[in-house]
């Protein structure tokens, strides 16, 4: 009786899947209107997670903590003590800007 001891090897390389290669889309957070910039009512000033910058004069806060201008005016970023910041919009005369 003939006994054959065969060892079969893979003829195609097994390719494992990588555990990398995924990432979430960036949320485009940050300051959208600079200090001293003229903005219109409704313009977004800051997109943020949590209140890193607090709303000040004529600035509203959306449910996702976005700060937006309530009136036409000039943006001013101010400090509240040592650790807090505030964004305000101060109205200006349109005639004064045009001149």
UniProtKB/Swiss-Prot annotation:
The keyword Ribonucleoprotein applies. The lineage of its organism: Bacteria, Bacillati, Bacillota, Clostridia, Eubacteriales. InterPro entries: Ribosomal_bL27, Ribosomal_bL27_CS. Residues 1-9 form a propeptide. NCBIfam families: L27 (TIGR00062). PANTHER family: LARGE RIBOSOMAL SUBUNIT PROTEIN BL27M, RIBOSOMAL PROTEIN L27. It comes from the Bacteria. GO terms for cellular component: cytosolic large ribosomal subunit. This is Large ribosomal subunit protein bL27. GO terms for biological process: translation. HAMAP family: Ribosomal_bL27 (MF_00539). Gene3D superfamilies: 2.40.50.100. Keywords: Ribonucleoprotein, Ribosomal protein. GO terms for molecular function: structural constituent of ribosome. The N-terminus is cleaved by ribosomal processing cysteine protease Prp. It comes from Clostridium beijerinckii (strain ATCC 51743 / NCIMB 8052).
